[in-house]
Regions:
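Feature recognizes metal-dependent phosphohydrolase scaffolds
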Residues: 1-466
């Protein structure tokens, strides 16, 4: 009798949830079917999770890692064909899976009659696809199938040519794919399916943006990707702040872009108008070599000509001074941040050409500051004020940038917990003894998880139109 009372009490407490569940599962048979399904799924192998961090705009490397699943696809191919294919044949098959369109074009150049090639390759690809899909339910695989070939691929995945009763059936399907001229399209579709099934969930632990030229292309890929999340990095937050119109973030984003000569993301990616920036920099620093502001470029193939490098250096110096001024204004407005040690412009001795940082005097490597007023170093000139306002407008009206930031908000967070793994970017503030450091955030002292939650709350509030 007591058990019945407790049970009834629990049922009454959970009645709201039971009513909600009853909408989707109104009958006993539907409930039991769902229980059986979920319990069975729990006994499948754990789907493949993929972890990437610090992409920094390197889109080519990112795309290659997605295509080969960091070597996971090659490992599967070796498991299946290691004893039957030569090393070169394994490499060729893997290349086909990673880059099907390009590989097929090369094959067509070397061979006009591809019937035998397609016959062999299709059987190999079906075997690889069957292997990578084995972790998932049929329902999940079905949802991943390309609509154009969904029925055919599903039949081939679940019917084996080893079954004597189905040999003719499978053989005729493959022959007709080739005979109807659809082999190339089918190969590309199944290769892309293998890529997709090889990564069930993609975790990005911060910093899509920074020095590389293709952050916008990475975001385009992620916007169409089937399952991904991101734990925001410092560079991601900078771009999100810039998209929100924060002038300090805009100046910082531009300075870092000029530092690495990353103009593609700004101009080609997001359509940011650089003409006002270039005009201001050339006029203000016309007679300045700006040698300490020349861009850092590791890849010689990406290095612009000297004239362009000089212009980028001028823009780099111009926006750096604007950033230091805006940061100083921000620290003055928020003394509770205790960041007076970052107000460096006021430590400059213009006569001696030095600055003082943490009590140590350093000689300046550049002494030409035509826009700095020693009496009020953080005040923008009228021209600087006009420039930063125009740049702010460009960031606010960039539809592609705003769309990408919405994707970061939709899929992102300060930290994530997946399969008992704690994911976050870079570091968490800590004391010398290893305990979590308490930080004052708008009058609230928080640390660890509470700090992360509070920061994320502030980020989302900044984009909440309500």
């Amino acid at each position: 009798m007591p058990k019945t009372t407790i049970s009834n009490r629990n049922i009454n407490a959970d009645m709201r949830y039971l009513k909600l569940l009853a909408r989707d599962f109104p009958t006993i048979s539907q409930v039991t079917t769902e229980i059986i399904n979920l319990e069975a799924i729990l006994h499948l192998p754990k789907p493949t999770e993929h972890f990437l961090a610090d992409l920094h705009g390197e889109t080519e490397a990112f795309q290659h890692v997605l295509r080969n699943a960091s070597g996971n696809i090659k490992r599967k191919v070796k498991e299946l064909f290691g004893n039957t294919l030569r090393e070169k044949e394994i490499r060729d098959l893997c290349t086909l899976i990673y880059y099907p369109k390009q590989k097929l074009e090369l094959v067509k150049q070397n061979d006009t009659d591809l019937s035998d090639y397609y016959q062999t390759t299709l059987n190999q690809l079906i075997a690889v696809c069957r292997n990578v899909s084995s972790k998932y339910t049929r329902s999940k695989v079905r949802k991943s199938l390309p609509p154009e070939f969904a029925y055919i691929i599903e039949e081939l995945l679940h019917e084996s040519s080893d079954d004597r009763n189905k040999q003719a059936y499978v053989g005729v399907i493959i022959q007709n794919i080739i005979g109807t001229g659809r082999a190339a399209g089918f190969v590309m579709a199944i290769c892309e399916l293998i890529q997709r099934l090889s990564i069930d969930q993609l975790h990005i632990l911060g910093d899509i943006f920074d020095r590389g030229p293709g952050a916008h292309l990475i975001m385009d890929t992620l916007s169409k990707y089937h399952n991904w999340d991101i734990q925001w990095g410092n560079h991601d937050i900078l771009w999100m702040g810039a998209a929100a119109g924060n002038k300090v973030c805009i100046a910082s984003v531009l300075r870092l872009s000029f530092r690495y000569a990353n103009m593609q993301t700004l101009e080609e990616g997001y359509g940011i108008n650089m003409v006002p920036m270039a005009t201001f920099a050339m006029e203000t620093y016309a007679d300045d070599s700006c040698k300490v502001f020349f861009p850092k470029i590791e890849d010689p193939n990406r290095r612009p000509n000297e004239k362009t490098c000089k212009l980028i250096a001028q823009m780099h110096k111009a926006i750096a001074i604007i950033q230091f001024k805006l940061e100083g204004q921000l620290y003055q407005q928020h003394p509770e941040w205790n960041m007076d040690d970052r107000k460096l412009l006021e430590t400059i001795d213009f006569e001696k050409g030095t600055c003082c940082v943490d009590g140590t005097v350093y000689p300046l490597t550049d002494l030409n500051f035509p826009t700095l007023n020693p009496a009020n170093p953080y005040q923008l000139t009228a021209e600087e004020e006009d420039l930063i306002n125009r740049l702010q407008h460009s960031f606010l009206i960039s539809d592609r940038l705003q769309s990408h930031v919405q994707q970061l908000l939709l899929h992102g967070s300060m930290y994530g917990i997946y399969n008992s793994n704690l994911l976050f970017h870079a570091s968490v503030p800590m004391n010398q003894d290893g305990s979590l450091k308490k930080i004052d955030v708008e009058g609230q002292t928080v640390s660890g998880r509470e700090l992360m939650n509070r920061v994320e709350e502030l980020v989302r509030m900044a984009f909440d139109e309500d």
